[in-house]
C-alpha cells in the first residue's frame, strides 16, 4: 500500500495593484503572510511531506468523471491513480494495474491489478471499483464531459447511453450502463474490457484522469457533494485531501 500524504496546494492571484493601493500596513501584512506561507511550503518540501503548486482558479469539481478543466485535472492526478500512467519519458507504465494484455484482434484488453490496493479510508480497492467507475462514465445521468471520448469505443456503449438518435441526440431506449462491456473478475484481481473496434491507443486512454476510480459507496451515499469535503473525499492516489478552503488552497 502506498503511503498517503496530504496535499498542500496553494492558490495565488495577481494582487499587486490592489495591495499597493491599500497602504503600507496592508502591504506589510500581505508580505508577512506570503513569507509565512512560503516558509511552510519550503519546510514541507524539505521534509518530504508535501509540495506547493499554483493552480489558478478554484477547481469547479474534483470528481474525475465530471472534470473537464486543467485546474481540476492538476489536482486530480495527484490524489487519484488510474489503471495506467504515463511517465516522464512519455511511456505508458503500470498504475493500479501491474500488467495488461491485448488480444490479437485488438478487441479485448485485460488488466491485472496490483496486490494490496487501498482507498484513502483504508478499505480495499479492486477491479470492481474500476468496473463501476467506467460504467458511471457511460451513464447519461452522470453527464461526464469526456464520457464518449474515453469509453465510447467500449462495446455496449450505445446501449449504455440509451441509443441516442444521431440527428437529435435524444435517447431512443432506456439507458442500461450495465451493457458496457467492462467486467471485473469475481476475486477483483482482473478487469476485462471488450472494444467495438481496435483502439491501439487505449492504453493511453486508460491513463487519462477521467478514468480514475471513484468509490461507489461514497458517491451513492453523498451524491455530488462527495468530492467537496475532506471527510467524504475518498481517493486512491499518493496524496489525499485534508483541507479545502475555497478559492484559497487545497
Can you annotate each of these PLM segments?
Residues 47-57, 108-111, 130-133, 191-193, ...:
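Short, well-ordered beta-strand elements
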Residues 98-149, 192:
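Aromatic- and charge-enriched surface segment that lines or borders ligand/interaction sites
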Residues 177, 195-250:
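Gly/Pro-rich hinge or "lid" segments in bacterial periplasmic/extracellular proteins
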Residues 3-24:
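Sec-dependent N-terminal signal peptides of Gram-positive bacterial secreted proteins and lipoproteins
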Residues 54-104, 234-235:
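N-terminal lobe/hinge region of extracytoplasmic solute-binding protein
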Residues 131, 145-217:
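Surface-exposed binding/hinge segments that line
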Residues 22-34:
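Bacterial lipoprotein signal-peptidase II cleavage site
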Residues 35-52:
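Immediate post-signal peptide segment of exported/extracytoplasmic ligand-binding proteins
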